[in-house]
Curated annotation (Swiss-Prot):
Pfam families: Coprogen_oxidas (PF01218). GO terms for biological process: protoporphyrinogen IX biosynthetic process. InterPro entries: Coprogen_oxidase_aer, Coprogen_oxidase_aer_sf, Coprogen_oxidase_CS. This is Oxygen-dependent coproporphyrinogen-III oxidase. SUPFAM superfamilies: Coproporphyrinogen III oxidase (SSF102886). Gene3D superfamilies: Coproporphyrinogen III oxidase, aerobic. It catalyses: coproporphyrinogen III + O2 + 2 H(+) = protoporphyrinogen IX + 2 CO2 + 2 H2O. It comes from Salmonella typhimurium (strain LT2 / SGSC1412 / ATCC 700720). Its EC number is 1.3.3.3. Pathway: Porphyrin-containing compound metabolism; protoporphyrin-IX biosynthesis; protoporphyrinogen-IX from coproporphyrinogen-III (O2 route): step 1/1. Substrate binds at residues 92, 108-110, 258-260. The gene is hemF.
Length: 299
C-alpha cells in the first residue's frame, strides 16, 4: 500500500484525544487546548493539564506541518530530500507528576513524508516511550519494559531488544555520563517492510503508552512524600532539562527551524532546581538511583 498521510493524521488526532481523556480521568483535572497555525504551512493542537490532583503538568501535543521545501539544516544529512515538498506530523507528550515516587514519562510517535513529481515518496515513522524515575522500584521498571516487549512481539522477536538498546543509547547524558532514566523503546527511520506494517507498529507504540504508565501511577500515587523527596525530584528534573536542551534532536531541530517554541518546550518541568556539586547521602534512596538507572535487561 502506498503511504497514506491522511490516515496517519486521523490516527494521531484520535490518539491525542484518547491519551488526554485517559489522563484526565485518572487525575480529575482537564486539559486546556491551544490551537495554533504555522505561517509556512500547517499547525497543531497543544494541550496542557496543570496543577491537577496527580500531575503537576502534563502536555500532549499534536502537530502537522508541511511545506514546499525542507530547510537546509534538514537536507544537509539527507540530500535525497532536497527539492521535495514535505509533511511531518506527530503526537508528543510528557507527564510530570507531583509525587516524586511517580516517575516522569515521555512518549512520541511521528510520521514524515517527502514527495516530488515523477519520484517515489521518501517516508518513515519514528517514536517510542521512556520512563524517568526519581526513586527506583524494580516492579515498575519491569512492568514498563514488559509492556514494551509485549507490544513489540507480534512484529518480531528482535524488535524489542533492538529498540530497547536504541532507547538506552539515545537517552544518555554524555556530559554527565548517566542515563536519563530506565529507557523503554526508541525507533526512527522505519520504512520496511512496507507502509502498513510500519504504521501498525507505530499505532501499537502509541496505544501502548497508557498501558505501560498508568499502572505505575496507580501503584505510587498514595505514597507519602515530603520536602526531602520533593527537593530531590526538582534536582533530578534538572537532568531532564539538560538532556532536552543539549542532546534531544527533536527539540534542537524544532528550535533551529522556526518551530513553535511554546509547544516545543512544553516538555519542560514547571519547577526545577540545580545545586552545585550536590551529592546524595551514602546509602540513601537518593544515592541508589544512580545504580538503578544503569542499563540492564529488566525482563
Amino acid at each position: 500500500m502506498k503511504p497514506d498521510a491522511h490516515h496517519v493524521k486521523q490516527f494521531l488526532l484520535r490518539l491525542q484525544d484518547d491519551i488526554c481523556q485517559t489522563l484526565s480521568a485518572v487525575d480529575g483535572a482537564n486539559f486546556v487546548e491551544d490551537s495554533w497555525r504555522r505561517e509556512a504551512g500547517g499547525g497543531g493542537r497543544s494541550r496542557v493539564l496543570r496543577n491537577g490532583g496527580i500531575f503537576e503538568q502534563a502536555g500532549v501535543n499534536f502537530s502537522h506541518v508541511h511545506g514546499d521545501a525542507m530547510p537546509a539544516s534538514a537536507t544537509a544529512h539527507r540530500p535525497e530530500l532536497a527539492g521535495r515538498s514535505f509533511e511531518a506530523m506527530g503526537v508528543s507528550l510528557v507527564v510530570h507528576p507531583h509525587n516524586p515516587y511517580i516517575p516522569t514519562s515521555h512518549a512520541n510517535v511521528r510520521f514524515f513524508i517527502a514527495e516530488k513529481p515523477g519520484a517515489d515518496p521518501v517516508w518513515w515513522f519514528g517514536g517510542g516511550f521512556d520512563l524517568t524515575p526519581y526513586y527506583g522500584f524494580e516492579e515498575d521498571a519491569v512492568h514498563w519494559h514488559r509492556t514494551a516487549r509485549d507490544l513489540c512481539q507480534p512484529f518480531g522477536d528482535d524488535v524489542y531488544p533492538r529498540y530497547k538498546k536504541w532507547c538506552d543509547d539515545y537517552f544518555f547524558l554524555k556530559h554527565r555520563n548517566e542515563q536519563r532514566g530506565v529507557g523503554g523503546l526508541f525507533f526512527d527511520d522505519l520504512n520496511t517492510p512496507d507502509f502498513d506494517h510500519c504504521f501498525d507498529f507505530m499505532q501499537a507504540v502509541g496505544n501502548g503508552y497508557t498501558r505501560a504508565y498508568l499502572p505505575i501511577v496507580e501503584r505510587r500515587k498514595a505514597m507519602v512524600w515530603g520536602e526531602r523527596e520533593r527537593n530531590f525530584q526538582l534536582y533530578r528534573r534538572g537532568r531532564y532539562v539538560e538532556f532536552n536542551l543539549v542532546w534531544d534532536r527533536g527539540t534542537l531541530f524544532g528550535l533551529q527551524t522556526g518551530g513553535r517554541t511554546e509547544s516545543i518546550l512544553m516538555s519542560m518541568p514547571p519547577l526545577v532546581r540545580w545545586e552545585y556539586d550536590w551529592q546524595p547521602e551514602a546509602g540513601s534512596p537518593e544515592a541508589a538511583l544512580s545504580e538503578f538507572i544503569q542499563v540492564r535487561d529488566w525482563i
